[in-house]
Amino acid sequence: MPKIGMEPLRRKALVDAALRTIGHHGSLNVTMSDIAREAGVSAALAHHYFGSKQQLLLETIRSLLRDLRRDAVAALIRASGPREKLSAIVHVSFQSDQFTPETVAAWLAFYVEAQRSEETRRLLVIYSRRLRSNLMASLNRLCPPDDAARIAEGAAALIDGLYIRHSLRSAPLGLASAPALVEDYFDMQLKSFPDGQRAKPSIRTL
């Protein structure tokens, strides 16, 4: 029987091991035994805590989303003003820990899995909606609602597209240039609204 109080530690160890194992394999074509071995526990214990590989993989996605949300909340709290908050979102999206080999492999594998798994797709939709919500919270204070929605969609597409290109090492520019491209997009789109819009109370975060 697992020791009392060990479950949270074991679950986290298994999630971390799942991330590393996916990174090593470059896909979700891994087994519970592979993950358990990486975590230093038995496959039976892994099944005890998660029931199936699918449930463990879903928890791994949730863990990535929680980490991203935590970093976004901290960055938005530090930022002052809507334009600075947009920059904070951009820099969190391209921070170095999002580009570790295991994290990159996991995100790309989960996008592929979303074509087959409704639950995986739902979690990735949550990520997309949170990103758009964060962008809209600041853009609504800088330009009219219709323009805010349009700019948010463009920025989200840039962020996701640049992430994928850099993940696949197919981008002609270095990773350090990616945030600057999104910042240039914001500057170009917002130059027609130099005075911004009336401030709207909004504290939406990832």
UniProtKB/Swiss-Prot annotation:
Sorted alphabetically, the Gene Ontology BP terms of this entry are: glycine betaine biosynthetic process from choline; negative regulation of DNA-templated transcription
What pathway is this protein said to act in by its record? Amine and polyamine biosynthesis; betaine biosynthesis via choline pathway [regulation]
Q: Can you provide one Gene Ontology molecular function annotated for this UniProt record? A: transcription cis-regulatory region binding
Q: Name one Pfam family in it.
A: TetR_N
Q: Which residues bind DNA?
A: 31-50
Sorted alphabetically, the keyword list is:
DNA-binding, Repressor, Transcription, Transcription regulation
Which InterPro entries does the record associate with it? BetI_C (IPR039538), DNA-bd_HTH_TetR-type_CS (IPR023772), Homeodomain-like_sf (IPR009057), HTH-type_TetR-like_transc_reg (IPR050109), HTH_TetR (IPR001647), Tet_transcr_reg_TetR-rel_C_sf (IPR036271), Tscrpt_rep_BetI (IPR017757)
Q: Where does the HTH tetR-type domain lie?
A: 8-68
Gene3D superfamilies the record matches: Tetracycline Repressor, domain 2 (1.10.357.10)
Domain of life the protein comes from = Bacteria
Question: What HAMAP family does UniProt report for this protein, alphabetically?
Answer: HTH_type_BetI
- Which purpose does this protein serve, as stated in its record? Repressor involved in the biosynthesis of the osmoprotectant glycine betaine. It represses transcription of the choline transporter BetT and the genes of BetAB involved in the synthesis of glycine betaine.
Q: What name is this protein filed under?
A: HTH-type transcriptional regulator BetI
